[in-house]
Amino acid sequence: MVDMGGLDNLIANTAYLQARKTSDADSKELQRRRRSLMLPGPQSCEQLRQAMPADFNSLCEQQPIGRRLFRDFLATVPAYQEAMGFLEEVQSWELAEEGPAKGSTLQALVATCAVAPNPGQPHSFLSPALVTKCQAATTDEERASLVEQAKAEAMAFLQDQPFREFLVSPFYDKFLQWKVFEMQPVSDKYFEEFRVLGKGGFGEVCAVQVKNTGKMYACKKLDKKRLKKKSGEKMALSEKEILEKVSSPFVVSLAYAFESKSHLCLVMSLMNGGDLKFHIYSVGERGLDMNRVIFYSAQMTCGVLHLHSLGIVYRDLKPENVLLDDLGNCRLSDLGLAVQIQDGKPVTQRAGTNGYMAPEILMEKASYSYPVDWFAMGCSIYEMVAGRTPFKDYKEKISKEDLKQRTLKEEVRFQHQSFTEEAKDICRLFLAKTPEQRLGSREKSDDPRKHHFFKTINFPRLEAGLVDPPFVPDPSVVYAKDVDEIEDFSEVRGVEFDDKDKQFFQRFATGAVPIAWQEEIIETGLFEELNDPNRPAGCGEGNSSRSGVCLLL
């Protein structure tokens, strides 16, 4: 007899894997769609030009297309290009691995600052006083300090006249055209949907592909009726707004937020490598090799620090919520329980996952803040090493109350042979019962990245994506449950929507998220394609009398 469930799963996986392989703009259908696209005409950008704040950091640093076009503009003026080139050399030096070569680069940078490009004329972006200091520098400590000063002067130079000239240049006009293109309405017709990857309390997560770029994403589909029936609107909007605010290589990115007739949809980074819980318990022996534990812990720490810097407490850090991408880098996911700290006030609502919640959450009167995430970090590191959580053995049956009492009263024990002294120490510090004694929150400058557990990690290089992961997922494997193992939801009946609901849906469905969308446009080659002046006739910029955005869906 034919196993129809197995056949359905095979078909779903095959289509999904094929889509992943062809997401690089090589399909004929994708090329056909792209030929129908064009940027809006310049006249359609005038309203946006008046409304767009002249914010250098946003326009020229944070937004990928703005950053790209600003650098293209700088390349047209030698003095501006020189300043930009110097900043790029400084960044290369900052990210270089320690050693003699880095010291030589430092000396070369200071020598560049000390020698004027033309006899008797200092660099246009450096003050004469700084040039003189560079000429007199004799120690590496002096040189490093002078390079920092030169970096600040070069950046201040670019933010002045070059930025003002950029704002009245054709390069900025092109940026505005891309911004109008970015603001087009988004619906479910924008995507091709593939297999379901999992289910949650309010809906499902499935793989989707953007029809016009080929980019693959994960789409979290929240059932509108289920949200209303369970009063989940506030949580859904909170997750969306927090994801929108975060731009970190260590936290999943939100690319689109839209609504269909039946769902609110969050389109996020597709992490093909599975979650850390799967790798801890379902691949080989329980637990992970120490080099993987250190690498993932370092990236998780960076992710938590990024959230905290934005005033966000994660509240649900655990291996199940840490996902691997194609290359083996990890990101924090599922920010449904994340909360924004308001005016420094502690959180009093109990939330989290049993076994990972800090003692202060479990108290009779909960009152807590950022330190709860460091406690969960300790639980997660322990679990990656030992293949069990600190206060409950693998597959042990225990009540929530007993687990709570263990968390509140018992000291952590390290019986697994894989624990190194550094691993034991960082777990003890993260698992301190009181927030004031916990690593990451003992004082304002308490940085977990400085712990000797991370002595092999170069954090600036890690944040720049220059450290190779110790494990790369198999691209031919689908790290998700079989489709027939994922339960279907029963239909929600008797729920009707009123005007207030419709207003909420519109507030949620804001379309493309600028940074993630612009990264997609550049990464998939659409930026170069639509900017190509030699593009065939009929595939150029839009007619100025129309919106100019032509989409074939």
UniProtKB/Swiss-Prot annotation:
Sites where the protein binds ATP: 197-205, 220
Protein name: Rhodopsin kinase GRK7
PROSITE patterns tied to this protein: AGC_KINASE_CTER, PROTEIN_KINASE_ATP, PROTEIN_KINASE_DOM, PROTEIN_KINASE_ST, RGS
Domain AGC-kinase C-terminal intervals: 455-520
Originating organism: Sus scrofa (Pig)
Activity control note: Inhibited by phosphorylation of Ser-36.
Catalysed reaction equations from the record: L-threonyl-[rhodopsin] + ATP = O-phospho-L-threonyl-[rhodopsin] + ADP + H(+); L-seryl-[rhodopsin] + ATP = O-phospho-L-seryl-[rhodopsin] + ADP + H(+)
Source organism superkingdom: Eukaryota
The keyword Kinase is assigned to this record: yes
Positions carrying Cysteine methyl ester: 550
Cellular component, GO, one term: cytoplasm
Compartments reported by the entry: Membrane
Record domain Protein kinase: where: 191-454
Protein task: Retina-specific kinase involved in the shutoff of the photoresponse and adaptation to changing light conditions via cone opsin phosphorylation, including rhodopsin (RHO).
PANTHER family reported for this sequence: G PROTEIN-COUPLED RECEPTOR KINASE/RIBOSOMAL PROTEIN S6 KINASE (PTHR24355), RHODOPSIN KINASE GRK7 (PTHR24355:SF12)
Topological category with respect to the lipid bilayer: Lipid-anchor
Name of the gene encoding the protein in the UniProt record: GRK7
Molecular function terms, GO-annotated: ATP binding; rhodopsin kinase activity
Family: Belongs to the protein kinase superfamily. AGC Ser/Thr protein kinase family. GPRK subfamily.
S-geranylgeranyl cysteine lipid attachment residues: 550
